[in-house]
Amino acid sequence: QFAEDVVPWDERRFGLGQGLRPQLINFVKGNRVRVSGVTLLHSPFWVIHPLLCKNVTVDGVKIWNEGPNGDGCDPEACENVLIQNTHFHTGDDCIAIKSGRNNDGRMWNKPSRNIIIRNCVMEDGHGGIVIGSEISGGCKNVYAEDCTMDSPHLDRVLRIKTNNCRGGRIENINMRRVKVGQCKEAVVKINLDYEPEEPCYRGFEPEVRDVNVEDVTCRKSAYGVLIVGRDSVENVSDIRLKDCVFNGIGRENVRITGKTRNVKFDNVMMNGSLVLASEDRPYKSMAQWMTYSEMKRTPKSYLLDFASKPRWNYAVGIELEGLLDTYRVHGDDSILNYLHTYRQKMIDERGDVVGYDYNAFNLDNVRPAKFILRMQQYGARKGEKIALKIFMKQLLNQPRTREGVFWHKAIYANQVWLDGIFMGLPFYCDYAVKNCSPRKARRILDDAVNQMMQTDRRTYDEKTGLWKHAWDETHRQFWANPLTGQSRHTWARALGWYVMAMTECLDVMPDDYPRKAEVVALLQKVMKAVVQYQDKKSGVWYDVLDVESPKNYLESTASCMFAYVLLKGSRMGWLDTDFNEAGKRAYEGILKRFIRVNKDRTISLTDCCSVSGLGPGKGPFVPAGKENYKRDGSFDYYMSEPIRDNDAKGIGPFIWASLEMERLNAQ
């Protein structure tokens, strides 16, 4: 307050009992000042404080000061400063560069400048190298290099803190070749709103520009880069990070609020992901970015999903449908040609499908037919029409439970899986609406609705409010509860298949179809439960929904499915607007937790469960010796299945969720 009121320094009297603490070493207006080869302990306040000095050297000093406000070395309004070979263990900032607080700094008008910091070790403290907050006179030309920092109590590595009480320009700040074990908050933090409740005269907007951080590594932190700019002025600019690797980031790689300009990342990896400023991304659309990433990773569409040879596969069909929807929104014939390649490779002019076995009565094999059905609008082929009829014939002859629900496969006799509802019913409904008479289409839609409702009745678990992965009509499968026939747990992706099946069937049901409301009501029931199991911290979902265990993990494919259904369902009016907020939270969680930017500027979807299933156990169509008792539906079984990147079963739903977010953001 004395400074704000322009009280001369020699008239500033604080009086008895104010508890003012002196610095241990305080040089004022000195020249050629040197502190070297000493150990400094337990200062009441800052340890070394050169004020308005020139040509200062601190060399080979050991500082141990754990008290409050126990800064190690604070050059204030100084020029030509060298701090090297010094070990800091402090209760506050290790090095804090200053240039006067508020009006004092503005009256002095002496920026701290030409400061070199090298070969130092920083432990504990609020910051390793800090500029501010008493920085009203400005600061420029700081070079920090070849330092090491490592402590769970060290809050930040490079910190710039100021506010509009201080003002001042901070520029040309450089850090390189710094190795950090861990820090508590952020590797780099720039804060122009430090202590926003401080009583002072305001209106002195600070400016931070030309900050360069190169070859800095950190193994653990909460944030990589944390920038708090001003909302009223664009006073943070030209911030560049190059060749840095920050791992073990617990909260967010980069968080920027307020107005900034030209924040750049050049070969910066955080948590294994290449960091790009928004303007440097190759595509603004995440759907396009993922589509082109997959096309680059797998130039031949019939080898998607890690195939070594062409295969008729439900996961590939789902991904190709996602790519098709990217094409429908954004265009580009290269995508369309990529899609054509699959259909041309897999179905010949006679209607023969590579690898398809009608007699397996495998619902998974029906799913890619929906992609082929949708592609008819981009050129129909005779062989495809024949093949589509064969797939419809399979469904019409598919073995069923006594209640009329499709068996999942012949080898899974008498079993209803949530997965199978998605594999069979959307094509069943779509083909009927497009190719059958209205009366026959109505019968097929009724059949599909009945199957969804029976599946709900047989797999729903009142105890958890969730749906089990599968149900065995005989109650005799080794994985089935002998009383209910249900499997043990709710596998998130299985429930994702179930709700996506409802969504896709609703898409093709005519508005005047009287049982459409039943499907909407079921979708609402399931998604209400899904949202209750959404992880509050991350916004995404665990692989097994009904188990709380450290072994459980947040899983991406199911999270993409749920995000997509929440966003689309609310847009279509099938779900209330509250579900839209849950969908946005889920999508943001997916981007933060599961999307990795690779060095080649492609993106990947991480933490995908490769596969999970049940059995088969003994059955009428299971060859002897082909039983799989490992797949017993236990939690440990689900946790034993491999986790991988870029599983097609997640890529398609991620693209769909991304396109829904684009629609939402365009409103």
Model-identified regions with their sequence ranges:
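Extracellular/periplasmic carbohydrate-active domains that bind, remodel
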Residues: Q1-S278
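Asp-box/WD-like beta-propeller blade repeats and closely related beta-sheet repeat scaffolds
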Residues: A3-G15, P22, K385-M423
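Aromatic- and glycine-enriched pocket-lining scaffold segments that form the walls
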Residues: L24, G30, R34-L52, V405-W471, ...
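CBM-like carbohydrate-recognition segments
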Residues: R255, E279-R281, S285-G317, V329-N337, ...
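Long, well-ordered core segments of solenoidal/helical folds
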Residues: S285-L303, N337-G355, I386-V405, L445-W471, ...
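Inter-helical turn/loop segments and adjacent helix faces that build the functional surface
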Residues: H330, Y431-R443, C505-A517, G569-T577
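Oxyanion-binding "anion nests"
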Residues: V499-D546
